[in-house]
Amino acid sequence: MNSSSSNEKNGKKISPVFIYSAIIAAIVVLIGAIFPTQFDSVTNEVKMWITDKLGWYYLILTTIIVFFCIFLIFSPIGKLKLGKPNDKPEFNTISWFAMLFSAGMGIGLVFYGAAEPMSHFASPPDADPKTTEAYTEALRSTFFHWGFHAWAVYGVVALALAYAQFRKGEPGLLSRTLRPILGDKVEGPIGTFIDVLSVFATLVGVAVSLGMGALQINGGLNYLFGVPNTTWVQAIIIVIVTILFIASAWSGLSKGIQYLSNLNIGLGALLMIITLIIGPTVLILNMMTSSTGSLLNTFLFNSFDTAALNGQKREWMSTWTLYYWGWWLSWSPFVGVFIARVSKGRSIREFISGVLLVPAIVSFIWFSVCLLYTSDAADE
């Protein structure tokens, strides 16, 4: 009996989605390794084409998703439970917040915590650089990028997966959420294509996050211990982080991932609180409040603003806003699967409210603390 027949008999048949995704990923990595300069040039050209030709679509899509989430919170649909009527949440609320926050943002908040608002302060889209107005503009822009749009995208994908999985008994595959539209075609080549596309998009999102994390860790090691800031060191860091992630995932949600998420959110909260106390506390709170008001006041305009006749701002949007919208969309299959898995037993209203509001508010506080503490230290 050959190995393929043996695997099928033992229920270990390798999924076509895995095979196709692995082949595509290997080809892309191989091309990038052999032709790094050309690969970088081509991917940049593709990015520029997407942001130039499809930027309007990204803005409309993500904004519709935000308002769809708001509709779900206040509609009767919100009463539906993600699971059977007697199902209870598997994780307590604090651990649930910790896990979805760690999966959704993680290293991004650390990497961009001070860097992004400081960049906007030095070169704001709608204010004079390094002025009082630039502070508010910097935080408003950062809140906009890391706030409701990002978490609405995550929330809708996670909700679709959770509903299909826990109420309809479907596997946790993105293709199966489209059964009401595609019918049984989701079990054929069309479904495989959708799942391969979502896996590849996830790989791209993971690559960005791992790359940023490696740069951040390498920078810290270089500053503290003089470890060389090189590609090889960053590759080793990525390997170590990947091994730790696999070990955590292997130990299960209720052990490794839950404990790591709680530790992650605990250390992050401790760092944020200490920084808030030793920094310009009142100024941080005042600026956070003002910038939140500015965000809400300009929310609709900025959600649809394509800067069609403003070349400088359009270039800024390509670098920041549209880049983020693409990043959140590419990351959403992975984050959505995880959030769906840990949210069984919660109502749709509770689910959307928690996913949309809590992480966004925490992000606002984090960025306010990072910007004002960093700029205050720089002034001194």
Locate predicted features:
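Membrane-water interface regions at transmembrane-helix termini and the short interhelical loops
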Residues: 6-10, 35-50, 69-88, 140-145, ...
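Conserved small/polar residues in nucleotide/adenosyl-binding loops
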Residues: 373-380
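Hydrophobic alpha-helical transmembrane segments
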Residues: 62-63, 137-157, 307-331
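Selective recognition of specific alpha-helical transmembrane segments in multi-pass small-molecule
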Residues: 22, 99-108, 198-209, 235-250, ...
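Helix-loop-helix module between adjacent transmembrane segments
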Residues: 11-12, 16-19, 24-33, 66-69, ...
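Juxtamembrane inter-helical linkers in multi-pass membrane proteins
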Residues: 125-133, 174-190, 291-307, 375
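Hydrophobic alpha-helical segments and their helix-loop junctions in multi-pass secondary transporters
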Residues: 27-39, 63-78, 207-220, 224, ...
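N-terminal alpha-helical transmembrane segments of multi-pass membrane transport
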Residues: 2-134
